[in-house]
Amino acid sequence: MVDADAGVGIVGGGLAGALLALALRERGVPVLLLEAADGASATDLSYGVIPGIPLDPSPLARRAAAAARIWQALQRRHGDLGWRPRRSLPLPLSQVDTVRLKQRLGPVLAAAGVEQRRARVLALQPGGDRWALSLEGGERVAPARLVLAAGAGCLALAAELTAGLGMSWAGVLALPPAAAGASYPLKLPTRFTRLALEGRARALQQPAWVVDAGLVPWGEGGLAGQLSWLAASGAVSAGPDPAQAEGWLRHALATAPAPLAALAAASGDYRQVPVAFSRHGLPLAGRLPGGVWLFSGFRGAFAQVPLLAPLLAAALAAPAAAAAAAERELRQLGVWPALRAAG
């Protein structure tokens, strides 16, 4: 077994894991960030949209409405991360271009001193005062503290997390570059029906899906979508047949208002990824009874994660009084997990 020197091991190198790693490094904490080597992540195919006003009356939504300022501060500290102001009515919005974010995260994490490793985590094993991770290839690491921030991948490592997390599949069309000198407009649905579908996930007796027709700039191209598919009860599943799901998405786009309707026949690659959602509506950020920490289940991750990552870093690594204060704040925001132990 390799006894990792990292003070904190984070499983998942998407938005949640990366911003938590940066927040921990600001506190001088050694960090090992483990990311599976294959496939797109939910971060890669996210719209990256950040509303500038609260979308519900919860304390978290009120605080997350200021996320654009946090992104601006992150970019002043680390350089361009893809955050851009966007013109959109009736709501003030900004967006993180996830193509640019993906290009920049690796170098930014390296510059911050985060140890990054491409390796799939196969299993967790409790051992003494820390958890050991079995990695693909036979290696084992045992960081002093462990955070699961791998989205839907968390469910494969700790099945009991299904009490608080469900799985959906998100499908989008990755569109080719727009005409020279042009870019795709940002068009969002007036409401996201995905949230209502997730809210009734436990009652689903068969798979169900919805399409929230929208379009965002994505690198030089665009993302059109989004299809959301849930298995019965929102359980872990292999997802829908991609060809069939692409047909559902294109049919829904064809009935949407212009300019979305024209995208129904557009060239573009259909892509789908598993996504973790919170069964209680609020994300989960905190320590489980068995000692593993969880950072997952976001609704609007690009607004919620930048707010919560520094608080979770403080709860993990600050001196006792400051750590307790951070935990109280996470509890007040309603995100501290109330789940039984992993293992």
Regions found by a protein language model. Give the residues of each.
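C-terminal catalytic lobe of FAD-dependent flavoproteins
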Residues: 254-343
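A conserved short coil-to-beta-strand element within the FAD-binding core of flavoproteins
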Residues: 117-131
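Short hydrophobic core segments
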Residues: 9-11, 141-153, 309
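Glycine-rich FAD pyrophosphate-binding loop
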Residues: 25-45
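Active-site substrate-recognition segment that forms the wall
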Residues: 152-289
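A short alpha-helix-loop-beta-strand transition element characteristic
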Residues: 41-43, 72-89, 165, 319-327
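Dinucleotide-binding Rossmann-like beta1-alpha1 core, especially the glycine-rich loop
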Residues: 47-95, 103, 107, 111, ...
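Beta1/beta-strand and adjacent pyrophosphate-binding region of the FAD-binding site
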Residues: 2-16
